[in-house]
Amino acid sequence: MRVDLFDFDLPDERIALRPAEPRDSARLLVVDPDAESALSDHHVCDLPSFLRAGDALVFNDTKVIPAQLEGIRHRDGAGGQQVSATLHMRIGPSRWKAFAKPGKRIKEGDRIAFGHSGESCMIGSLDATVEEKGEAGEVTLAFDLSGPVLDEAIAAVGHIPLPPYIAAKRPEDERDRADYQTIYAREEGAVAAPTAGLHFTPALFEALDKAGIERHFVTLHVGAGTFLPVKADDTDDHKMHLESGYVSGEIAAGLNAVKARGGRIVCVGTTSLRLIESAAGESGEIKPWAGATGIFITPGYRFKAVDMLMTNFHLPRSTLFMLVSAFSGFETMHAAYKHAISTGYRFYSYGDASLLFRKDK
């Protein structure tokens, strides 16, 4: 499909710079393409009323790390140059894939000293060698530190990598360290938050428990590639970024049991959906799964396991708007976004949410 078919105009003032307080007071647009009235306006705290006892919410429990690093590049003894790197996928105890700026001036073999003005952190120098250079500013960094010691060093000098549409308007601050993290995050490794999960509060969890809604947790480490623009003119020519994660045998069995009892699988966020669909066979059975997924979902895709999706409002021309268009219908989602814009919904990571029913007709 032509990528420009997924374009729409979004006024700048619709981009949320801070989350709603409390989190579950955010607005919730319910989209049911097969209902007589496809769109209805609610709040996230109303979520239990749209679910049934025996349904299962699937959350992504990845935890955002301070993956934005600033440093000084050194080459052949020459003077240093300021560079930045956003880590996006760990490929070994001491090696990370990253997006570096300015990418054109970085070469294989360069040494980069990360930290404030290239200084050492308390547990040692956070230095790395550019091991490999790829496309679009992507590099492979081999750090001198390894394992938990490397993790500690990154935590000491790194910054939360706010999405570019927020970072362009204000700097990251201490509040973001809490705001840009779900309350159930536990598996470190994400560069971006699974933002649909940001709306959940202890009070909402309690209400869901009382309604008999199950909670299941999977892990997909969201990478910086989620913010990369689609540069191709046709979806067939777009290469999807890879993200690593896993579905345990216990979770797979639990979700299959939910389906067998007639319950629905409700994914909280596109990351949970992409992971569950990667783990599902053609019959819809979910199997234990671990690895890197590059699943790219566009209209025409047949969903195998997921029945409902809770997700925020996405960028024009993005792979995520393509995904929701595949899930609830191309025309329905264009109408939903037009409604959201005209009625003041807040967009993107800190914005409001939508609850989507899968289009079956």
From Swiss-Prot:
Main location: cytoplasm
One GO MF term attached to the UniProt entry: S-adenosylmethionine:tRNA ribosyltransferase-isomerase activity
Catalyzed reactions: 7-aminomethyl-7-carbaguanosine(34) in tRNA + S-adenosyl-L-methionine = epoxyqueuosine(34) in tRNA + adenine + L-methionine + 2 H(+)
GO cellular component, one term: cytoplasm
Pathway(s) this gene product operates in, as recorded in its UniProt entry: tRNA modification; tRNA-queuosine biosynthesis
InterPro entries noted in UniProt: QueA, QueA_dom1, QueA_dom2, QueA_sf
Keywords: Cytoplasm, Queuosine biosynthesis, S-adenosyl-L-methionine, Transferase
EC number: 2.4.99.17
One GO-annotated biological process of the protein: queuosine biosynthetic process
Localization: Cytoplasm
Superkingdom assignment: Bacteria
Subunit structure, interactors included: Monomer.
Reported function: Transfers and isomerizes the ribose moiety from AdoMet to the 7-aminomethyl group of 7-deazaguanine (preQ1-tRNA) to give epoxyqueuosine (oQ-tRNA).
Family membership noted in the UniProt record: Belongs to the QueA family.
PANTHER family listed in its UniProt record: S-ADENOSYLMETHIONINE:TRNA RIBOSYLTRANSFERASE-ISOMERASE
Record's protein name: S-adenosylmethionine:tRNA ribosyltransferase-isomerase
